[in-house]
Amino acid sequence: MPSNNSSFLDIDDDLEGVDDFGNEPNPFDDATVPDSPNMNNSTAGKGSEFYNTTGSKAESAPLQGQMDPPAYDQVIGQNDNDGLGRNGLRPGLINYYSKYFQIDLTQFKKRLSAVLTFRNDHNSESNEDNTDLYGAVWITATVVMINFTMSRGLNFIISDVIEGVKTGEDIDRASQFKKLLHSIWLFYGYTFGVPFITMQVLNRDEHSERNRSFKSVPELISVYGYANLIWIPVCVILNILDMSKRLRTVQAIQWAIVALGWAQSSYFLNSQISSNNNTETQSNGKFSLSIIVVVALHTLFCLLFRFIIF
């Protein structure tokens, strides 16, 4: 009789609910849950066996992917066995030109001092290709920024600081940005454009033995870039004199300073392009066609610098 009552209560209402799963077995009844080693019950034996097994594996083998952190001076991702150095970077345009910006500070200072002291040390360290474009980019950028900020800075110091007169409304911003644009195209165009012409002239010169053998155009660009170091003090002096440029005496001094910069930079270019062992040519006073073309282009550059910027 009780069984009939239980079957009478088992009514399917065609709705999904808890009563639909009342007669189904519990899937967790047959699951074996291991006990922790510290549990004091009858099932602790099997549980302790499970934990002892996993614990021994964890102690003997480290976690997958676990490694010590890199040292303080270690470059992440660097592999000492890949054989890739300054001349062995992986293919790619950025990697190709990035080697020209890997320069030692001592070597950079040595090249800067060689320009100012008329020494021929720029490319005489060794036969290894130590060409850099770092100097060509940043020395030229320094010259451009001096031409852009020097005049305004001097006016601010003299008028606003010393005399105490505000001259903010009298600034000729059009002439300042005009000088900036002219400095950019003139110096960067000369530094990175003329070496392509010079390279072609050097390759076609009949007296090529008088000239140094350049392996690539970036090597010539590096020479022209370091030659711009001479124009840093020249531009500083010219900007100071430019405040009184109406006087004829000041204009004559500006011409003399530009001529001095031309002479020193021309000498540096000549010393770098000419062969170091060419003592016979230097004693006879003869110059190759390449040197004549280089000096002529440099003279044109100095004239444009004098008339356009100052």
UniProtKB/Swiss-Prot annotation:
Family: Belongs to the YIP1 family.
Role according to the record: Possible role in vesicle-mediated transport. May be involved in proper membrane localization of Rab GTPases.
KW Heme (keyword) present: no
Subunit comment: Interacts with SNX3, TVP18, TVP23, YIP1 and YIP4. Interacts with SEC4; The C-terminal cysteines in the Rab GTPase SEC4 are essential for the interaction. Interacts with YPT1, YPT6, YPT7, YPT10, YPT11, YPT31, YPT32 and YPT52; These proteins are all Rab GTPases.
Record region (Disordered): 1-84
Major subcellular site: membrane
Transmembrane segments: 131-151, 181-201, 220-240, 249-269, 290-310
Gene Ontology BP term (one): vesicle-mediated transport
Topological type in the membrane: Multi-pass membrane protein
Biological source species: Saccharomyces cerevisiae (strain ATCC 204508 / S288c) (Baker's yeast)
Entry's Gene Ontology molecular function annotations: small GTPase binding
Residue numbers bearing the Phosphoserine modification: S60
Note: Present with 937 molecules/cell in log phase SD medium.
Record's compositionally biased regions (Polar residues): 35-57
Pfam families: Yip1 (PF04893)
InterPro entries, alphabetized: Yip1_dom, Yip5/YIPF1/YIPF2
Listed name of the protein: Protein YIP5
Keywords per UniProt: Membrane, Phosphoprotein, Transmembrane, Transmembrane helix
Compositional bias of kind Acidic residues: 10-22
One cellular component (GO) term of this entry: membrane
Compartments it resides in: Membrane
Entry keyword annotation includes Ligase: no
Gene it is expressed from: YIP5
